């Protein structure tokens, strides 16, 4: 029939009868492992290929069970379907077997996974339950020879030996501990402090460890699990569980663990609950019962159940009671898709909508609230209609039910439309809440059409996309970077937020009133009650009836009103509904679709084009969306800038040697450091020297040149004046004597003119014509004297560059103290000189420095939500406000409302009606996910992560920089700290929001102001001690509509989010990196860390065992100053023997890259060094010998680099010798002029005085 034979993975199994074949005899034998794998593969292929299967054969001996049948029991859901189909086929051939059905139910139980099986095996003899009243209240475990049990777990350990041990209490860690007997120490857990991020195991499966926190999926682990250990893959204990708290879809665990030093550390997330099995008790009719086991449930006694829930609405076990009341005992537990069945306790309602199709109306889909605070573009609405339930109250997905004048009707959700400026996409609905994704718009409208009638409701609300990050994009990008954000959860999980419910007020139902003959008859629905109020001939009737009743006094239907009474359903506590008369039973249900932490894809702006200049950076920016550019200096004054760039621009910034950082959009920060480079040549001609120093130190260079110019000018002027004064004093006596003859020497010095000469030019002309030799002598004598004196002064003057030399004192014999800069990544090398021993090199490089302040949480603030009680309306009577006890609660009584109104209050009277309006403030539903924490910061502790090398021994360790806590390694004892500078980037008051820290002077607890940060305050997110001050003022309701109007200040939290400055992450001085969990600053380049070493004698080497240099000569082959190890020095030497020697520069002029070098008996060694000196001259210590290295350094070629300079920066570069030579020449020439003038003036004065005395 077919052109080819079909191919099968194995021969098809023939049809077998549905009854099991007789069991074959079994003989024990050992199957090869490969044969077992082939057999399992063959069986799996057969299961996937054929549908007609016989039942599994009876189980074999225990030895065969795990090999053959265990894999079959772990098949997925696809095989489950086959089993159902097989059951259907069997039903046709014979009656069902009850035992077989029971067996099938047992087989569907979930088998523990690999992690759980491993933990159960390890826990079997190392973890012991703690019993209390016959129940397991928690667990105790034996770790490292010690017994640990949570202190909050009461009861007795289920082991006689361990129960008899006397434990010690450590209340700080919530633990009790004791040493176990010696015979039990072989069976104890081992512990470890190594906790790389990843997954670990505990009794309930996998535990995720990330960012120092242990989390499990929500619902895994509960009360009674306190004391269970968390194990790694090697079976070692990494933590002990104490409790947990739900955080969205995951549960954060409170644990006790160990750090690198073996010290116990406790981590407790906020609002954590202890997981001891303590039964919560609830109350019903003065009788207590476990909240998880109520005596009644809603399906059997709805009215009584609502009353029970109302009594226990503030009980800590309300959630357990609500879940148990919804799920009646004996009812089959349904899947997780049917969570939040509690909304069957409620019903939809009609409420006033301010804008329907035509004006305001009573709408079945009135919109109560709209929220759009997430970063995913979704909108959550609360309406008077309900979703996920049909008209009968049963669960039905993608369905909306609504109240149409007392009748509950339903409609498919796809027939409901929602739109802003354009249509929205409805994602899902649950209870009173609807989740949709909407485009931007200034209003939102919901409508549906039923029986040719369109029902709609619109509310003003600005719907817009909220971008996350530092780029203001309007649509999520396809590609980009992942960033933490807040999104609306698309499920109805319990996340701790509630919406308040209460019994509905009475509603007029005209269909209950009928006219029978000449009298009025009221017929309430079956199982319900009705309140009848009539005014017939001056007679007032007010009566509650359960069955039909005739009122003969009334002859018209308009004289009577029948109010439908309901006490078996709740409605939302809306300000648009009247409150039921009397004490209203209230409750609360969970809010679905809350904000949760998630990951959003954010765009990355095009990388800026960077151009480097001398101490400057130019950024050419071309953003696609408005993007923030933030910069700061990595110095003591950050001088940060924060700018929103919307168009292509060019921005120029200056960069210093201490560093500069910029953050462009959502890109990671980039840092640059300027090098000590400049044009010109510090060793060249004067104009090159001036150009070089002008670019490096413009103000100092201008000042120096000005001073030099002033000195030269003053020198020339002073010399000229002195020469003129001396000449006049010398020639005056001879001018007054007729025919006086002037001595030749005086005439030459004073340039005296002859009798025939009248002017200088005439004198020169006379000498030129009559005596040219005298002419040249007259001109060369001053010049020769000037040259001679200048050369003499140059030889006498000693050129000394001004350097700051920081010498390191030699260490003692056993103890060594030094100081290293507190800057991550900067290596610090030193040596220990001990008499009789070779120098011991020490190298320290801090990889990370943490500054952790001690913080105290003052309060938490977030968005507030205004709660409004349904107005209490009393017709033809007066009311008073009851005492207020809720946060910022306001209460007012309004009279003269609702005259003769037929919609809502239905009052007969005109002005005697009263309404009591109440409004108060509470935390928003999304406060758990979107809130700010106000802390007070105190003294900070410092941790340094160091790479330490002492001699040939290295270690990576963490040390507390407090001057007290030592670290021991290889016999070396190291004590660090305290810091030389008690500095912290955190102010006394700080605010943490969205993973970032802000220095903000927030108001104290209880002193918040309306519209400002802290307008609502709570000690924790879940605590009930809420303080609020929002300027809430109630307004008079408008006649004709039941509502509670009010005015209120805008949210101070929202205003603070808009106005807040950049966080410390972008503005902290000294380049600090700010992190949270815990709040800390890392790698702040400020201050120095004192170090004290205690070094054992075993690490020292005798001098006789080390080489000694007999001759050494140092030459600088290449030297670039202010560059990372830009200097290369070659040392030619002759040593007594080969070996290893420590090298060190005692002064701070140079920083060496090498800590030790290998020496031969004769040769040369190359050493790399860094220096900030233009003309370095330093002594290099090699073992116990010293050699001097000196030379000239040139500036680096690169103006800007991407890493800091790895050398000491405690001094600036010196002035070059060339510059000093030119400077002294200039100043020396000016001094010579002054000296010559003074000498001449002195000679002339002495001659004049002598001549006068002689005369």
Curated annotation (Swiss-Prot):
Region of interest: Interaction with the capsid protein: 725-729
Modified residues (Phosphothreonine): 93, 108, 127
Phosphoserine PTM positions: 124
UniProt superkingdom: Viruses
Region annotation (Disordered) ranges: 44-119
Catalysed reactions, as listed in the record: Autocatalytic release of the core protein from the N-terminus of the togavirus structural polyprotein by hydrolysis of a -Trp-|-Ser- bond
Motif position, Supraphysiological nuclear export signal: 41-48
UniProt-annotated stretches for the region Interaction with spike glycoprotein E2: 168-173, 260-264
Region (Ribosome-binding): 112-126
Modification comment: Structural polyprotein: Specific enzymatic cleavages in vivo yield mature proteins. Capsid protein is auto-cleaved during polyprotein translation, unmasking a signal peptide at the N-terminus of the precursor of E3/E2. The remaining polyprotein is then targeted to the host endoplasmic reticulum, where host signal peptidase cleaves it into pE2, 6K and E1 proteins. pE2 is further processed to mature E3 and E2 by host furin in trans-Golgi vesicle.
UniProt note: domains: Structural polyprotein: As soon as the capsid protein has been autocleaved, an internal uncleaved signal peptide directs the remaining polyprotein to the endoplasmic reticulum.
Annotated protein name in UniProt: Structural polyprotein
Species annotation: Venezuelan equine encephalitis virus (strain 3880) (VEEV)
């Amino acid at each position: 029939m077919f052109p080819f034979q079909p191919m099968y993975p194995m021969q098809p199994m023939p049809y077998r009868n549905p009854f099991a074949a007789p069991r074959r005899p079994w003989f024990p034998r050992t199957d090869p492992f490969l044969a077992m794998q082939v057999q399992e593969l063959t069986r799996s292929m057969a299961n996937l290929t054929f549908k007609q299967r016989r039942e599994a054969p009876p189980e074999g001996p225990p030895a065969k069970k795990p090999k053959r049948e265990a894999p079959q029991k772990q098949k997925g859901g696809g095989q489950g379907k086959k089993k159902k189909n097989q059951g259907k086929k069997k039903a046709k051939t014979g009656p069902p077997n009850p035992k077989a059905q029971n067996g099938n139910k047992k087989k569907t139980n979930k088998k523990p996974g690999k992690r759980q099986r491993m933990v159960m095996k390890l826990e079997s003899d190392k973890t012991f339950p703690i019993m209390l009243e016959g129940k397991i209240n928690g667990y105790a475990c034996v770790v490292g020879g010690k017994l640990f049990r949570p202190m909050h777990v009461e009861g007795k350990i289920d082991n006689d030996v361990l129960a008899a041990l006397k434990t010690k209490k450590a209340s700080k860690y919530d633990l009790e501990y004791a040493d176990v007997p010696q015979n039990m120490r072989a069976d104890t857990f081992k512990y470890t402090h190594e906790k790389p991020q990843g997954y670990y195991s505990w009794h309930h499966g996998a535990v995720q460890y990330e960012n120092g926190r242990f989390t499990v999926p929500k619902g895994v682990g509960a009360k009674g699990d306190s004391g269970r250990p968390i194990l790694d893959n090697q079976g070692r204990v990494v933590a002990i569980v104490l409790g947990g708290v739900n955080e969205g879809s995951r549960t954060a665990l409170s644990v006790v663990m160990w750090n690198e030093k073996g010290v116990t550390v406790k981590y407790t997330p906020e609002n954590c609950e202890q997981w001891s099995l303590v039964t919560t008790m609830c109350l019903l009719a003065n009788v207590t019962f476990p909240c998880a086991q109520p005596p009644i449930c809603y399906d059997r006694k709805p009215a009584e159940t609502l009353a029970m829930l109302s009594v226990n609405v503030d009980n800590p076990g309300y959630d357990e009671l609500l879940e148990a009341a919804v799920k009646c005992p004996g009812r089959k537990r349904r899947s997780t898709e049917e969570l939040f069945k509690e909304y069957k306790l409620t019903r939809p309602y009609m409420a006033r909508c301010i804008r329907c199709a035509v004006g305001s109306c009573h709408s079945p889909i009135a919109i109560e609230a709209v929220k759009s605070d997430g970063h995913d573009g979704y909108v959550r609405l609360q309406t008077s209609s309900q979703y996920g339930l049909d008209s009968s109250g049963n669960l039905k997905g993608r369905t909306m039910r609504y109240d149409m004048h007392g009748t509950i009707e339903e409609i498919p959700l796809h027939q409901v439309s929602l739109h802003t400026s354009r249509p929205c996409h409805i994602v899902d609905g649950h209870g009173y809440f609807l989740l949709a994704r909407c485009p931007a718009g200034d209003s939102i409208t919901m409508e549906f059409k039923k029986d040719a009638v369109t029902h709609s409701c619109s509310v003003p609300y600005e719907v817009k996309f909220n971008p996350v990050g530092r780029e203001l994009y309007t649509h999520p990008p396809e590609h980009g970077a992942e960033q933490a954000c807040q999104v609306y959860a698309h499920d109805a999980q319990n996340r701790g937020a509630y919406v308040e419910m209460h019994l509905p007020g009475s509603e007029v139902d005209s269909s209950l009133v009928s006219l029978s003959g000449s009298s009025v008859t009221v017929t309430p629905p079956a199982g319900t009650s009705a309140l009848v109020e009539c005014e017939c001939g001056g007679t007032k009737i007010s009566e509650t009836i359960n069955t039909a009743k005739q009122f003969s006094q009334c002859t018209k239907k308009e004289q009577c009103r029948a109010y439908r009474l309901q006490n078996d359903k709740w409605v939302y506590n809306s300000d648009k509904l009247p409150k039921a008369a009397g004490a209203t039973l209230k409750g609360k249900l969970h809010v679905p679709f809350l904000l949760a932490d998630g990951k959003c894809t954010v765009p990355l702006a095009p990388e800026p084009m960077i151009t480097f200049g001398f101490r400057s950076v130019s950024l050419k920016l071309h953003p696609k969306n408005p993007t923030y550019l933030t910069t700061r200096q990595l110095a003591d004054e950050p001088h940060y800038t924060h700018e929103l760039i919307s168009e292509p621009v060019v921005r120029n910034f200056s960069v210093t040697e201490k560093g500069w950082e910029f953050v462009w959009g959502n890109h990671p920060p980039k840092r640059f450091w300027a090098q000590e480079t400049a044009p010109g040549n510090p060793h060249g001609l004067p104009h090159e020297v001036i150009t070089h120093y002008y670019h490096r130190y413009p103000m100092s260079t201008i000042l120096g040149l000005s001073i030099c110019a002033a000195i030269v000018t003053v020198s020339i002027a002073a010399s000229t004046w002195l020469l003129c004064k001396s000449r006049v004093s010398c020639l005056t006596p001879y001018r007054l004597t007729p025919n006086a003859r002037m001595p030749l020497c005086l005439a030459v010095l004073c340039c005296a003119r002859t009798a025939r000469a009248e002017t200088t030019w005439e004198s020169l002309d006379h000498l030129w014509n009559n005596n040219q030799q005298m002419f040249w002598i007259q001109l060369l004598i001053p010049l020769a004297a000037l040259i001679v004196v200048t050369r003499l002064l140059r030889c006498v003057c000693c050129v000394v560059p001004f350097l700051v030399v920081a010498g390191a004192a030699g260490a003692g014999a056993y103890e060594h103290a030094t100081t290293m800069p507190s800057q991550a990544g900067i290596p610090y090398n030193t040596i220990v000189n001990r008499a009789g021993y070779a120098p011991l090199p020490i190298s320290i490089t801090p990889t990370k420095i943490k500054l952790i302040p001690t913080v105290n949480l003052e309060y938490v603030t977030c968005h507030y939500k205004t709660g409004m009680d349904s107005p209490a309306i009393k017709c033809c009577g007066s009311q008073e406000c009851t005492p207020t006890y809720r946060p910022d609660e306001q209460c007012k009584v309004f009279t003269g409302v609702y005259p003769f109104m037929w919609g809502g209050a239905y009052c007969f009277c005109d002005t005697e009606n009263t309404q009591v309006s109440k409004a108060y403030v509470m935390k928003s539903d999304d406060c758990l996910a979107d809130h700010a924490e106000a802390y007070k910061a105190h003294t900070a502790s410092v941790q340094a992560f160091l790479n330490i090398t002492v001699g040939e021994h290295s270690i990576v360790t963490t040390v507390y920089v407090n001057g007290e806590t030592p670290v021991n390694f290889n016999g070396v004892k190291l004590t660090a700290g305290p810091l030389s500078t008690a500095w912290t980037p955190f102010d006394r008051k700080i605010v943490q929001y969205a993973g970032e820290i802000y220095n903000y002077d927030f108001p104290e607890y209880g002193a918040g102001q309306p519209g400002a940060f802290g307008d609502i305050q709570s000690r924790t997110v879940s605590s009930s001690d809420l303080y609020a001050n929002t300027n809430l003022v109630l307004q008079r309701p408008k006649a004709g509509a039941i509502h509670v109007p009010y005015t209120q200040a805008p949210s101070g939290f929202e205003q603070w989010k808009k106005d807040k400055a950049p966080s410390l992450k972008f503005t902290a001085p000294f380049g600090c990196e700010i992190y949270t969990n815990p709040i800390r600053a890392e790698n702040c380049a400020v201050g120095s860390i004192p170090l004290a070493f205690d070094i054992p004698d075993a690490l020292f080497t005798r001098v006789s065992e080390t080489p000694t240099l007999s001759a050494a000569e140092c030459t600088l082959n290449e030297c670039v100053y202010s560059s990372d190890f830009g200097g290369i020095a070659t040392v030619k030497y002759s040593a007594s023997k080969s070996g290893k020697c420590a090298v060190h520069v005692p002064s701070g002029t140079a920083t060496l890259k090498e800590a030790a070098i290998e020496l031969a008996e004769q040769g040369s060694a190359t050493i790399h060094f860094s220096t900030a000196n233009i003309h370095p001259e330093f002594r290099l210590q090699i073992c116990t010998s010293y050699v001097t290295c000196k030379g000239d350094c040139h500036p680096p070629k690169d103006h800007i680099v991407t890493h800091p300079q790895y050398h000491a920066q405690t001094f600036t570069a010196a002035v070059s010798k060339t510059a000093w030579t030119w400077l002294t020449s200039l100043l020396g020439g000016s001094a010579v002029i002054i000296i010559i003038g003074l000498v001449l003036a002195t000679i002339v004065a002495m001659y004049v005085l002598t001549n006068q005395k002689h005369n």
